[in-house]
C-alpha cells in the first residue's frame, strides 16, 4: 500500500548491507510517497542509510489525488483500467486467505474509494479509505523533515495530482526542496522538439542528488 514505509526500510537496509557506501534513493509516483514516509518515520536513522531522497510525480496528498482520479476522464479511462488489474490480484489473495476482505464488495468497486474501503483499508488495519489516505499521505509530515535532504518534484499539469494540493514552501521543512514546473505531466517531463526526449528528468534529478554525496 502507498504508505508502507516498513517495506521501504526493509529494502534499503538490505541494499546497504549488500553494497556498503553512500546511497541515494528515488521513488516514482506512489513509490515516492512511500519513500518520503519512510524518511519521515526513520528520522535520524534515515541519514545513516541514505544521503538524500527524491520523489518524482508522487501523490503526497492521497485524499486529493484519490478524489481527482475518481471523477471525469480519469475515472472513465485510468481508474477503470487500473482497477481491472487490481481486482483480480485482490480476489486471488482472498483465495489464499479467505475472510480477509469482502470479495463481493471488491468485485462491485468502480472507483478507488470503493476499492480501498473494500480491500486496501481493512487488510492493512485502517478504519476506511479516508483513514488510509490521511495516515499514509506524506504531505502533512514534510514540515518535520530535517535529517535527510529530500527533493519533491511535481509538474503542475499532472493529470492525476491537482496543482492545488501540492505542498508549498511554508508546508515543508528545511531539508525539503520543491520543484514544481508548469509542465511535465505524470512522470513525463519531455524536452526538445517533437517527438522530444525524456533524458532531462533523470539528469536533473541525478545532478541534485549528487550534490549530497
Language model: regions and residue ranges:
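Alpha/beta-hydrolase active-site loop
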Residues: 1-18, 37
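Alpha/beta-hydrolase-fold enzymes
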Residues: 19, 24-123
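Short beta-strand/loop motif that positions the catalytic acidic residue
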Residues: 145-146, 151-154, 158
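Short, hydrophobic alpha-helical segments
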Residues: 16, 205, 209-213
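Active-site nucleophile elbow and catalytic-triad environment of alpha/beta-hydrolase enzymes
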Residues: 118-142
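Conserved loop-alpha-helix segment in the C-terminal half of the alpha/beta-hydrolase fold
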Residues: 156-177
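Catalytic histidine-centered segment of alpha/beta-hydrolase-like enzymes
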Residues: 184-198
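Short, conserved loop/helix-junction motifs that constitute active-site signature segments
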Residues: 47-48, 142-146, 169-173
